Every structure is written in C-alpha cells, then in structure tokens.
C-alpha cells in the first residue's frame, strides 16, 4: 500500500485493519517517529500503541552520490552544490537530508516526489539528481550492487549510531557533532535505524495472538532456510524482538523535552 512514505499504510493498519492477528504490516521506519517529533499532519496513529512484532535488522544509512556529480567525500558535500532525491515526508530519504542540511549548512538542494528508491536511482543515472542520503547500505549493496561495485556510486557519509564494518573509513554522522545537546537530538533522530525493518500489528489484537506472532517472528529469524535466502540476496539479518522494539519507543518517549524540541527543530527549520 504505497503513499506518503508509508503514512497511508500505517494509518490503515492502525485504524482499519482487522484486530484479530491476521493483519500485519511493515513500513518505512521513520514514519512512526514523526508524531514524536511534533509532525502530526496526516498522522492517525500512536506508535506506542502498536503491537510490535519485531524488526529484521538494524541499519546503516548512507549518502551515496554518482561519481559524475563531482562529490566524492564528506568535505565535498560541505563545499560543492548538489541535488539529493527524496520521497515522502517521514521517509529516511526526506528526513536525513533535511537534518544534514540544517546541522552542517550544506549547499544541498532537495528534490522531492520520487515514488521510491528504484525511481531515485533511475533519476541519478539520468543525472536529474546527484544522489541519495538515508540510503540503506544493505539495499545499496544488494539491489544496486553493480553501480557501487563499478565505482559509479561513491559513499560519503554513514547515518547511524555506529559504523558498519564494511565502511571503516567513511565518516559517521554522530562523530561530526561536538555540541552535547545537538548530539543528543541527532541520536534521537538516528535511533530509528535500530528498527530498520519493523513489523507491527494494530492495537487491540488479543495478547495471546500478539505473543504467537512474536514467537513466529523470532523463530523465522533463526530459521536456516530464511537466513540462507537472506544471505543470497545480500540482506543482513540483525533482529530485534518485539519487546526490544517496544523498549526503544519507551526510551524515546522518555527523552528530555529540550532534546525532543531540538530534534524537532532540526527537521522543521529547513522544511
């Protein structure tokens, strides 16, 4: 169910989907954080009330740019004008470029309206845009491996709470901020990467059915056939249980108000 960076799907899950355990959804992880940061337009859900089943992996987002753009390093991003593609509000491709532009005053133009990652990659190849920020590293090396392997795409920045072992020499965004309050706010925004591939059921599902869904998810994450297929597709499996995802939301909702306010301002200021 496409639309508005998963907003349509999540609103449906929360308000209209059956509440008997037969309806589950996965969606862009960033959208569930929007109301927590004060962006409530169009949202018809409370993420804390969803029945979280688990997340297949945590994630490292990257800024990936075409080599033809002339942007090859983080230093280049700070000094040379470039265009970045985006999809819907709340999607990583929208949120992370805005935060980067706001924090570091990048000479970046955001080109919104793309219907997903594949469309943005085509736009890059056509030179409509120069790249993407918030691009899932695992997606890049699986779906667009040829572009990266042939050197057509250059990775200039990691967007996560910790570096990926594949990218030891690529800067990590949280290492680039010295101000403690700004760093805390940035980490609040970036924490969505810890639930990179989330699954949830609507509120109101009977507890025993939620427990069954969680057990099935956990069993799948250990299933040899599933893991082998994921490996063939170059998709990482670093699961978080439903309880762990719920704990993350509990931690976020307990964040100090000044940190939440600053995180919201990082996104709002340059929208």
PLM regions and their residue ranges:
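Early extracytoplasmic/lumenal segment of secretory-pathway proteins
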Residues: 1-11
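An extracytoplasmic/periplasmic, membrane-proximal ligand-sensing/linker region
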Residues: 149-152, 156, 176-178, 205-271
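Short loop/turn segments at beta->alpha junctions
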Residues: 5, 115-116, 241
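Hinge/capping helix and adjacent helix->loop/strand transition within the periplasmic-binding protein
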Residues: 12-23, 31-127, 173, 177-184, ...
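A ligand-binding cleft/hinge motif common to bilobed small-molecule-binding domains
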Residues: 29-41, 94-103, 131-176
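Short beta-strand and adjacent tight-turn residues that come in two discontinuous sequence segments
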Residues: 26-27, 87, 113, 133-135, ...
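PG/GG-rich flexible active-site loop of Rossmann-like NAD(P)H-dependent oxidoreductases
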Residues: 3-4, 27-32, 204, 270
């Amino acid at each position: 169910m496409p639309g508005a960076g998963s907003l349509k799907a999540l609103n449906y899950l929360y308000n209209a989907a059956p509440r008997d355990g037969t309806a589950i959804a996965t969606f862009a992880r960033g959208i569930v954080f929007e109301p927590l940061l004060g962006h409530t337009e169009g949202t018809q859900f409370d993420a804390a009330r969803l029945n979280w089943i688990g997340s297949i992996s945590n994630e490292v987002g990257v800024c990936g740019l075409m080599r033809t753009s002339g942007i090859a390093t983080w230093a280049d991003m700070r000094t040379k004008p470039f265009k970045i593609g985006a999809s819907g509000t709340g999607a990583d491709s929208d949120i992370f470029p805005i935060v980067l532009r706001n924090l570091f005053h990048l000479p970046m133009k955001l080109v919104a309206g793309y219907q997903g990652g594949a469309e943005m990659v085509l736009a890059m190849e056509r030179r409509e845009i120069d790249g993407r920020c918030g691009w899932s590293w695992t997606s890049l090396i699986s779906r667009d491996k040829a572009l990266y392997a042939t050197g057509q795409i250059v990775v200039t920045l990691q967007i996560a709470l910790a570096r990926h072992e594949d990218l030891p020499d690529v800067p990590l965004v949280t290492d680039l901020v010295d101000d403690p309050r700004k760093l805390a706010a940035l980490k609040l925004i970036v924490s969505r990467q810890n639930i990179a591939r989330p699954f949830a059921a609507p509120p109101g599902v009977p507890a025993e059915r939620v427990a069954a869904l969680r057990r099935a998810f956990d069993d799948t994450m250990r299933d040899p056939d599933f893991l082998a297929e994921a490996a063939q597709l170059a998709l990482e499996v670093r699961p978080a249980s439903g309880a762990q995802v719920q704990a993350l939301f509990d931690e976020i909702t307990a964040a100090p108000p000044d940190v939440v306010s600053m995180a919201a301002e990082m996104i709002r200021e340059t929208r």
